Amino acid sequence: MRHTIDVGLLLSIDGTYQCIGRNALAGATHALQEINANPDYPFTLQVTHINPQGFLHSYSEGAVQLMQAGVRHIFGATTSASRKEIIPDLEQNGSLLWYACPYEGFESSENVLYLGGCPNQTLIPLLRYALQAFGSCAALIGSNYIWGWESNRVAREVLEVAGGTVLLEKYVHLGTTRFS
């Protein structure tokens, strides 16, 4: 007889990151269905999805709700802020976050599996190409948030080593879509 493991999906399907959250939810749901359909596994995964709706405080509330229901494995939290928001709750309850999104690095918790890449892993190859194709002057624009700050720090260092120049460094609110 297969035993059941409760898992949680903490993914916003509304708000700024709804496209990412909806795709992640669809992918996770498909993967969980495949796992549960495989008779070789001695377990099934029982899923509970919480939709924080893109509100930072709702991630912590959702994580606590999942853990109070017995969930010890949580998948999701799209942003660094949402991940950081729930780490104290995870650590207090001995639960594990499976964090698949890119993150800024320089963080370590025994209660988080960091599965996504860091800015240096994508920016360095991109900047090598951009420096050759477009020259050594750049404008660095990012979200006023740890991901934007860290990405621009890496970009600035690469440009400096290459003898390039940062013409502008600007940060905008998360969710900004209009630029003039």
Residue ranges of model-derived segments:
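A short, Lys/Arg-enriched amphipathic alpha-helix followed by its capping loop at the start of a domain
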Residues: 27-41
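An alpha-beta-alpha
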Residues: 115-171
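Extracytoplasmic "Venus flytrap"
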Residues: 2-4, 8-29, 50-52
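Short beta-strand elements in bilobed, periplasmic/extracellular small-molecule ligand-binding domains
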Residues: 37-54, 109-111, 159-176
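Beta-alpha junction/loop-to-helix N-cap segments that form part of ligand/metal-binding clefts
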Residues: 23, 38-105
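Gly/Ser/Thr-rich loops at beta-strand to alpha-helix junctions
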Residues: 14, 78-81, 144-149
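Extracellular glycoside hydrolase catalytic/binding regions
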Residues: 95-125
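Alpha-helical structural signal in soluble globular domains
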Residues: 31-35, 85, 89, 93, ...
